[in-house]
Amino acid sequence: MSEGNDQDQGKGRLSLRPAGRKDVGRTVDAGSVRQSFSHGRSKVVQVEVRKKRGPGPAPAGSGSGSSGGGRAGGRGGSGGRALTASELATRQRVLEEQRAEAVRREQERREQEKIMILSAAEEARRRDEEARRAAEDEVREKEEAAARAREEEAERRASAQAHGQAGTPSRAEPEPESSGPVVSAVPIPGAVTLAPPMERLRPLAERAIMPARPVTPSRPATPAATPQAPGETLRLRTGRVGEAEDDRRPARRPGGGIAPGRKPSGASPKKGGDSRRSGRIDVQAAIEGDDDKTRSLASVRRQRERERRQAELERLRADQVRVVRDVILPETITVQELANRMAARQGEVIKALMKMGVMATVTQSLDADTAELVVQEFGHRVRRVADSDVEIGIEGIEDQPEDLLPRPPVVTVMGHVDHGKTSLLDALRTTDVAAAEAGGITQHIGAYQVTLPSGSKITFIDTPGHEAFTAMRARGASVTDVVVLVVAADDGVMPQTIEAIRHAKAANAPIIVAINKCDKPGANPERVRQELLSHEIVVESMGGDTQDVEVSALKRTGLDKLEEAILLQAEMLDLRANPDRVAEGSVIESRLDRGRGPVATVLVQKGTLRRGDIVVAGAEWGRVRAMLDDRGRQIQEAAPAMPVEILGIAGVPGAGEPFVVVDNENRAREISEFRQRVIRDRTAAGQTAARGTLDQMLARIQAGAQKEVAVLIKADVQGSAEALQATVLKLEHEEVKVRVLTAGVGQITESDVQLAKASDAVIIAFNVRATTQARELAQREGVDIRYYSIIYQVADDVEQLVKGKVAPKHREKFLGYAEIRKVFDITKVGKVAGCYVTEGVVKRGCGVRLLRDNVVVHEGELSQLKRFKDDVKEVARGYECGLSFAGYNDLREGDMVECYEMELVPA
C-alpha cells in the first residue's frame, strides 16, 4: 500500500527533460505558397507545418547523479530515502523506451530530409522551365510592341503629310519616354524592392517547410550602382504611409481592384504581416501593368488566329472584282424584283431598307426614289425609266431580206351600203353570209381566207358600208394590201364610196374597182367609170393604172377575172413575211361570247401565232387557249396573213388594236396595266373637260340652258359598240348634250342597270339581252332598256330624245319567253317548233325574236300558235305549245323565243 502511494506521488517527478530546462522553441512553422492557374491567374495559400513536442536525449550521468545525490541525500540527510528495486527497474525501462523513441525519430527526420532534397530538385527543374517560358513571352511581347510602335509612327506620319506637316514632328505630342511618370531608381522611403521574379519563385516544398522570409527595405543605392528600369521596381506599401497622396488612395486588392472597406482590426500585427502583404501593389504599378499576371499562350494564340483570318478576309475582299450593274428602275417596283435586278439577296435589300427607316417585305412595292437610294447603297448604276418605256422593243427586230417568204395578200372589200360587198364575198367563198345579216346590211368585220383552184390563197376582210362604221373601214384599210372597191352599176358612186376611196389612199393601198350588179336592168358600168374620174380613180380602160372588173355576185359571173386581178396586183407588190419569229398583227373584231369568254378575231401580219403563246392585245393580255379558223375548225398555228379567232384573253380588246406575242407573263401584265392606266386617265380627263369648271356648271344649271341625255350602250361586238357610240355623239344639239356613260360588249347585267339608274340614263342594247335579274331590277327601278338590231333605229330614237321627243309613239312591251324543245318538219307548212313557255305569255300575232346564246338571230312575227291541234290566242307560263314563224325555218333545239308587242304610248 505504501509502495503504491509512493508511486502515485512520484508520478509528478518523472520527466524526460532535465530539471530546470524549459522548451521555448516553436512547434508550428508557417509560410505562404503562390499557386499558378491558367490564363495568368494565381493565388497565395498559407501553409503550416506542425512539429511534435519531444525531449532531447538525457545528458550522461544525469540519472546516476540524481540517484547518487538522492542516495547521498538519503544517506546524509535526515529525511532521504533510498530507491527500491522496483522503482529503479521502472526508471530503467522508461529510459530505454526514450532512447528507442529518439532513434526512431532520428530515422524519420533523415527520411524527411531525403524527400525534401528530391522535392527541391523537382521544383528547380520546374522553375527553370517557367523561366524559359517567361523569357520567350517577354521577347515576343517586345517584338509586338515594336511592331505596334512602327505602325503608329507610320500612321502619324501619314496624317501629318495629309495636313501638310510631313517631316516636322508635332511639338504638342509628348515624347515616348515621357508618356508616363518617371520612376527614379533611388529607393523611396516606406517602399521596398521585391526580389527578382526568379527569387520569388521558391520551391513549393521549401516554402511549405521553412517559414516565409520577410521582405526587408532595400538599402539606399546610387543610380549608377543599381540601374533599374522603371518597370522593374514596384513600390510596396509597408505599414502606414503618411503622404497625403497615399491617404487619398483607396485600398487595392492584389490584382489591382478596389477592395471593400473593412473595419480596423484590434489585434496586433503578427510577425509575418509584411510577407502576407507582399503581393499588393500601388496605383502606379497597377497603371503600368507591372504585375506578375500575363495572358496565357492559348489566349494569345486565339487572338493571332483571329487577326490572321481577318487579314485574309480583307485581302480576299480587296482582290475580289466588284460587279457594277445598270439597274433599270420603273415608277414602282417590288423588293423582290429589285433584289433580282441587282443580283443581291432579298434579306440584304430588306436590311438596307431598315437602315433607311423603311419596314418592307419582299412583296411590297417601292417608289422609284426609294429604290434608287437602295441601288446606290449597293454601288450599282441607276437608270430611271418612264411607265411608257415598258413598250420599248415590243415590236421586235427588223427582218432580214433572206428570211422573208411569200405570203397571201390581204384584200379588204369596201363600198357603199347595199352595193353587194358581202354577196360578192359569199360568191367567192361559196357560202351564204348575207342572208344572216340583220336588215341585209353588214354590221361586223368578217375575215375569211379563200383557197383558189390554183392553190393560191387570198385573205378577205369584209367591212360595213354604213355611215356609222367609219372606224371599221379605217381599221380594214390599215391592215390591207389591196382594196376592192365595190360600186353598184345602177347606183354609181355614193357617199360611203367616196369615204372608202379616202381610206384606201390614206393607207397607200392599191385599188381594184369591182362594178357589181351588172346583170340588173339599167346597169351602166361606163357611168361608174366616169364618176370615178372625179375622185382621181382612172381605170385601165381609160388609160389609167387602176384595174376594173365587171362582176355579178348574184349570177356569179366575172369572179375568175376578179381573182386574177387580185393575184396580179399581189405579185406586183411582192408581199413577203418572216414566219420564223414572234407573231404580230391586228385585232379585226372582238366580242364577249357566253361559254367561251372574250373572243378576238385577229389577223397575223408577221411571224407565226401558236397555241400557248402569251399575247398582248391592246390593253388586254392572255395565253392563247384555242385558235379557230374562219370555218370554226381548231388549228394549232396561224401563218402570216391568216385570220383566226383566239380564246384565252382576259378581257375584250379594242377593235383595231395591235397584238403582239411577248416572252413571259410579267412583261405582258406590265404592258397591259400601263395601257389600262392610260385609258383611265384619258377618260377621266375627258369627263373633267366636258364638265368644265364648277362655276360654269352652276351657271348652266341656274340658267337651265343645257340639258343632257345619258345613254349606256351594250353591243354584241366591240366594233358595233364603237359605231353606236360615234353615231350617238353625232346627234348632239347645242341645247342638249349626249353623254355616253359606257360602251361595252356582252349582256346587260345588274351593275349596268344600277349605273343607268344613278345617272338617269337609257340603256341601248344592240343584239344582246338583259339577264333575268337585270330585267327585274330595271322594272323595279324604272330604268328604260331598249333593244335594237339595226343601227338606223338607234339613230332615230336617240335623235328623237335629243329633239325633245322623250318617248316614241310606239313602245315595245315584253310578253314572255318560250324554249324550243323539239323541231318538226310539216309538209306545206315548214318547220314548227314545239315550245315550253318559261316566263310570261305567248300571244298569237305578237312580234318574236329568236335568241341563240343570247344573240338575236331572227326577228319577225308569230304566224301560228297552237296547243295540241287547236289554234289558241295565247299560252301562259308552264304550258306547251307549237309555234311557227313567218318566212323563217332555221330553228334549233335549245333556242329561246322572246315574245313582245308594240303599244302606243301618248307623248
Curated annotation (Swiss-Prot):
Single GO MF annotation: GTPase activity
Region (G3): 462-465
A Gene Ontology term for the protein's cellular component: cytosol
G2: annotated segments: 440-444
Extent of Gly residues compositional bias: 62-80
Keywords of this entry: Cytoplasm, GTP-binding, Initiation factor, Nucleotide-binding, Protein biosynthesis
Compartment(s): Cytoplasm
InterPro entries on file: EF-G-like_DII (IPR053905), EFTu-like_2 (IPR004161), IF2_assoc_dom_bac (IPR013575), IF2_II (IPR044145), IF2_N (IPR006847), P-loop_NTPase (IPR027417), Small_GTP-bd (IPR005225), T_Tr_GTP-bd_dom (IPR000795)
Sequence segments annotated as region (G1): 415-422
Location of the region described as Disordered in the Swiss-Prot/TrEMBL record: 1-305
Region (G4): 516-519
Domain tr-type G: from-to ranges: 406-576
Location, primary (coarse class): cytoplasm
SUPFAM superfamilies: Initiation factor IF2/eIF5b, domain 3, P-loop containing nucleoside triphosphate hydrolases, Translation proteins
Regions of compositional bias (Low complexity) in chain numbering: 211-230
Name under which the protein is recorded: Translation initiation factor IF-2
Lineage of the organism: Bacteria, Pseudomonadati, Pseudomonadota, Alphaproteobacteria, Acetobacterales
